[in-house]
């Protein structure tokens, strides 16, 4: 089975750019009810995944930061505490399953590290659930 079977394409996925402000990211997370979101550079390369926890730690360590001030702080200033690794479009199912066990979603990139979408743990579980008649 090919991992592309599970792919949710980029145009159906929320993501941010590493040039966004902390406030823009917080608002996007809040608007969509996410706790983490893929981050891309301006060329569309996958950079990392930023989480609410990463932002909270940044705020904790920069207590003078207000919501207003967060409009002027770029999200790339926030340290990523837990790497969410991507897989290549040519990855095998074993690679996907290894990652999806530990991540809610797995970013998928092409050979040039361009972000092409995500695979969610929910979709993988749903497939195997239906396949086994549960």
Identify the role of each PLM range:
Residues 1-13, 70-83:
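Bateman (tandem CBS) regulatory domains
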Residues 15-34, 40-41, 59, 84-103, ...:
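The conserved cystathionine-beta-synthase
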Residues 35-39, 43-52:
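Short, well-structured hydrophobic secondary-structure segments
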Residues 47-55, 106, 117-124:
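Short hydrophobic beta-strand motif reused across regulatory alpha/beta modules
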Residues 54-70, 124-134:
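A short, polar/charged loop-to-alpha-helix boundary motif
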């Amino acid at each position: 089975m090919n991992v592309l079977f599970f792919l949710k394409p980029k145009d159906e996925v929320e993501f941010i750019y590493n040039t966004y402000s902390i406030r823009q990211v917080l608002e996007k997370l809040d608007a969509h009810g996410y706790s983490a979101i893929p981050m891309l550079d301006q060329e569309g390369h996958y950079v990392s995944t930023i989480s609410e926890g990463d932002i909270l730690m940044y705020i904790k360590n920069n207590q003078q930061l207000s919501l207003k001030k967060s409009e002027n702080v770029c999200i790339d200033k926030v340290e990523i505490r837990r790497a969410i690794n991507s897989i290549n479009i040519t990855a095998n199912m074993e690679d996907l399953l290894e990652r999806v066990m530990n991540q809610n979603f797995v970013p998928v990139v092409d050979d040039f590290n361009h972000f092409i979408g995500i695979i969610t743990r929910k979709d993988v579980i749903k497939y195997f659930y239906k396949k086994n008649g549960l």
